[in-house]
């Protein structure tokens, strides 16, 4: 949301190669950073991206749009997500799909981790 959070996000954004063909505990593959957001890409391909995120309490992403459908799976914590003007509180173990081009935003109610899957058409 804030420019400070954006700066932390940019510094913490990492592309990392993860071992394939082994069992992964997704939530343990990403840490939290105080006052910030971290992302780690698991898979990046022309067909789409799968990215892990962690958000400290109160951090978030301001309203934006993406040209593709996106699935958010909350791994830990609680997040408020707005999609097309409707507020949803999403908890660990729950998911939500953002339709392509739908305005959406999120704010961490408490620290949370999520897996974002975006399939390109």
Predicted regions located by residue number:
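A cytosolic small-molecule/anion-sensing beta-strand core signal
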Residues: 75-76, 91-92, 110
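Ligand-binding loop in jelly-roll beta-barrel domains
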Residues: 100-121
């Amino acid at each position: 949301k804030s420019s400070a959070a954006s700066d932390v996000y940019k510094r913490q954004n990492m592309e990392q190669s993860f071992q394939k063909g082994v069992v992964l505990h997704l939530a343990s593959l990403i840490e939290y950073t105080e006052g910030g957001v971290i992302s780690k890409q698991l898979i990046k391909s022309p067909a789409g991206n799968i990215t892990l995120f962690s958000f400290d309490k109160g951090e978030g992403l301001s309203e934006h749009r993406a040209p593709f459908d996106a699935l958010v799976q909350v791994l830990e914590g609680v997040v408020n997500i707005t999609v097309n003007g409707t507020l949803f509180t999403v908890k660990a173990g729950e998911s939500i799909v953002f339709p392509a081009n739908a305005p959406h935003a999120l704010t961490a109610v408490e620290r949370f981790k999520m897996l974002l899957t975006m399939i390109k058409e």
